[in-house]
C-alpha cells in the first residue's frame, strides 16, 4: 500500500508538468497503472475476476 503522504503529494499540481505521474485510484500504487481504467494491474485483475469491470472477460485462444 502507498503511504498516505505520497497520495496527498500526488494530488497537488506538480511544479513541472513532466513530474506528473499516474497512481492507482484504489490502492495508490504508482507503477503499472492502466490509463484507460485508472487502476493498477493487480486491482484490475481482482476486479476483472469478480466481474466488476464491464466489457472485460478472460481471454482464451
From Swiss-Prot:
Q: Choose one Gene Ontology CC annotation of this protein and give it.
A: cytoplasm
Q: Where are the transmembrane segments?
A: none
Entry-linked Pfam families: Ribosomal_S14 (PF00253)
Q: What does the record note on quaternary structure? A: Part of the 30S ribosomal subunit. Contacts proteins S3 and S10.
Q: Which PANTHER family match?
A: 30S RIBOSOMAL PROTEIN S14, SMALL RIBOSOMAL SUBUNIT PROTEIN US14M
Q: Which cofactor does it need?
A: Zn(2+)
Write down the superkingdom of origin. Answer: Bacteria
Keywords from UniProt, A to Z, are: Metal-binding, Ribonucleoprotein, Ribosomal protein, RNA-binding, rRNA-binding, Zinc
Q: What does this protein do?
A: Binds 16S rRNA, required for the assembly of 30S particles and may also be responsible for determining the conformation of the 16S rRNA at the A site.
Residues that, per the record, bind Zn(2+): 24, 27, 40, 43
Q: Does the keyword rRNA-binding apply?
A: yes
| Cofactor note text | Binds 1 zinc ion per subunit.
A molecular-function term among this protein's GO annotations: rRNA binding
Q: What is this protein called?
A: Small ribosomal subunit protein uS14
- Which GO terms of type biological process are on file? translation
Q: Could you confirm whether the keyword Hydrolase appears in this record?
A: no
Q: Which organism is it from?
A: Lachnospira eligens (strain ATCC 27750 / DSM 3376 / VPI C15-48 / C15-B4) (Eubacterium eligens)
Question: Which cysteine pairs are joined by S-S bonds?
Answer: none
Amino acid at each position: 500500500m502507498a503511504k498516505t503522504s505520497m497520495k496527498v503529494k500526488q494530488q497537488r499540481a506538480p511544479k513541472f508538468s513532466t513530474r506528473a505521474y499516474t497512481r492507482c485510484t484504489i490502492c495508490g500504487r504508482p507503477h503499472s497503472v492502466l490509463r484507460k481504467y485508472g487502476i493498477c494491474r493487480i486491482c484490475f485483475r481482482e476486479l476483472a475476476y469478480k466481474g466488476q469491470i464491464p466489457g472485460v472477460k478472460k481471454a482464451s485462444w
